[in-house]
């Protein structure tokens, strides 16, 4: 695990910040997955692998500002995911798996569960409240990361 640098120290509450999310499965088209991570030095890494119709893996890396790391940390703190436990969540299966790892300050959590198709899967689980928090946090984080990646790679610099 990387240690916090200047970017990690600039987040509310101080200390290290690291986040990694993975969702994927192995099936008809091979190993298909989506993965992203925020590193303490501000590097955002993104990978999307789909072999459907012979697509190739998409990999993007970008450095984000301390304010972006603060926003990612705020999203996580407001979700209260750090209070949850994945013991009663569905185990990964042939449909796929999800992993979420977060380090904030001196707290470190790591969740593993199956792919969640819809809120019906959440409501019928043994821990619907905890899994609902996970489900919505993942939706928020994916939206945040997709926006950052799309903005960074589509916006052209202003020529003066």
UniProtKB/Swiss-Prot annotation:
Known tissue expression: Expressed in root, leaf and developing seed tissue.
Compartment annotation: Nucleus; Cytoplasm
Keywords for this protein: Cytoplasm, mRNA processing, mRNA splicing, mRNA transport, Nonsense-mediated mRNA decay, Nucleus, RNA-binding, Translation regulation, Transport
GO molecular function, one term: RNA binding
Source species, domain of life: Eukaryota
Location, primary (coarse class): nucleus
Record's note on what induces expression: Induced by gibberellin, abscisic acid (ABA), auxin and brassinosteroid.
Family: Belongs to the mago nashi family.
Summary of the function given for this chain in its UniProt record: Core component of the splicing-dependent multiprotein exon junction complex (EJC) deposited at splice junctions on mRNAs. The EJC is a dynamic structure consisting of core proteins and several peripheral nuclear and cytoplasmic associated factors that join the complex only transiently either during EJC assembly or during subsequent mRNA metabolism.
Record's subunit section: Heterodimer with Y14A. Heterodimer with Y14B. Part of the mRNA splicing-dependent exon junction complex (EJC); the core complex contains MLN51/CASC3, EIF4A3, MAGO and Y14.
Protein name stated in the entry: Protein mago nashi homolog 2
Lineage, broadest ranks: Eukaryota, Viridiplantae, Streptophyta, Embryophyta, Tracheophyta
Primary gene name: MAGO2
């Amino acid at each position: 695990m990387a240690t916090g640098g200047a970017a990690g120290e600039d987040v509310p509450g101080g200390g290290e910040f690291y986040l990694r999310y993975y969702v994927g499965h192995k099936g008809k088209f091979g190993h298909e997955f989506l993965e992203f991570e925020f590193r303490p030095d501000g590097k955002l890494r993104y990978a999307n692998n789909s072999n459907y119709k012979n697509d190739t893996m998409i990999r993007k890396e970008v450095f984000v500002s301390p304010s972006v790391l603060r926003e990612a940390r705020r999203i996580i703190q407001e979700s209260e995911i750090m209070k949850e436990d994945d013991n009663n969540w569905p185990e990964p299966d042939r449909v796929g798996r999800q992993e979420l790892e977060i380090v904030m300050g001196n707290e470190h959590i790591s969740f593993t569960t199956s792919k969640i198709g819809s809120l019906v899967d959440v409501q019928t689980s043994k821990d619907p409240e905890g899994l609902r928090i996970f489900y919505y946090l993942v939706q928020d984080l994916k939206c945040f990361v997709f926006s950052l990646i799309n903005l960074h790679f589509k916006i052209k610099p202003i020529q003066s």
